[in-house]
UniProtKB/Swiss-Prot annotation:
EC numbers for this chain: 2.8.1.7
Active site per database record: C374
Listed name of the protein: Probable cysteine desulfurase
Enzyme class: transferase
Chemical reaction(s) catalysed: (sulfur carrier)-H + L-cysteine = (sulfur carrier)-SH + L-alanine
Lineage of the organism: Bacteria, Pseudomonadati, Pseudomonadota, Gammaproteobacteria, Lysobacterales
Protein source organism: Xylella fastidiosa (strain Temecula1 / ATCC 700964)
Family the entry assigns: Belongs to the class-V pyridoxal-phosphate-dependent aminotransferase family. Csd subfamily.
TM ranges: none
Amino acid sequence: MDRINTSAAPPTSPDWERLRADFPLLQRHVHGKPLIYFDNANTAQKPQAVITATDTFYRRHNANISRAVHTLGTEATEAYEATRAALATLLNVPMHELVLCSGTTFAINLIAYSWALPRLRTGDVILVSRMEHHANIVPWQLIAERTGARIQVADILPNGTLDLDALHTLMTPQVKLLAITHVSNVLGTVNPIHDICRQARQRGITTVVDGSQAAPHRHINIPAIGCDFYAITGHKLYGPTGTGALWARREHLHIMPPFLGGGEMIKEVSFDGTLFNTPPHKFEAGTPNIAGFIGLSAAVDYVRRIGIDQIETRETELLAHLTEELQKIDGMRLFGTAPNKAAVVSFMIEGTHAHDLATLLDLEGVAVRSGQHCAHPLLQYYGVTATCRASLAFYNTHEEIERFITALLKVRKLLG
């Protein structure tokens, strides 16, 4: 069989400049200047291996999965399931406990409507942290409205770390669910997720972990974390948009009803009733983003060949350099100075607005994000309506950081 190759990947010993060349978009110019892409927490750029894998699928293997015995259908199905296997290896979980979906937002809503909605009652508590992305707040608000449950918020300390004493105090018998991010998309704070999940499990609290910002940058060993649910997003992991995965404990998957109905999630259908498929397939109704998941498989292979520990070390070095240079700027305010951080820095300069900074930086070829970063309650805590956020990936360089600082100083001068 003409197999889909998703493993055209870099050398085992990282040569960061060579790896950077694997990303076609990083070669472009913006407003006549070399692009500096510092918006990786928003989405990561895609290596050529990912682009080639999706292109090859459409050129040579395009067919639906699990619905045909012909050669193309078999090839597509095998390649799609190979993605599940690659993700399972990355996260150290069994394949049959991994639901493929469109991303973390879908995954959390799946948990909300299939696990929480049938179980929560008036008086129950859903515990979330101040630093959550809206995708890990709004679904729980919707469930609370429908069930009579209450939402309580675990607050943070000024340096952007969770107030762990307060969190543990809030873990009362009324708390049935704890929804928490592994890594903050605004602050970069890496939460002590192993300890938090252990404390919750001792109290009989079900845990949902948003791993969107963690999976691309850190080694994830889900059994060691000890959570009940863990969700990731493919497009932040150098894969295509519209891809992601939800891991759930086997006992949860078997008792949860399907979230959506349609093809593939059934075994038998009659007008008298339907027999659903077994997990994880009963949660995968309809035709998925097949090409996207094949691209995600290539992305996972690419990351594993570099080594996630190598990536973390590289990004930690870049973060230290960026933070040091930002702290030298008069009027600079950094949000989130936790001792354990991913390569995300949110900042403001006194007397300027985040959108003005980002707009003028774009004219210098620099891409950063400005706004509230889908985390309104967190910015309210800091008393601001918007920040700029620079977020790094392994393919960024120290030279880019120097150019970014030069551009930032120029913009600051223009804004007076």
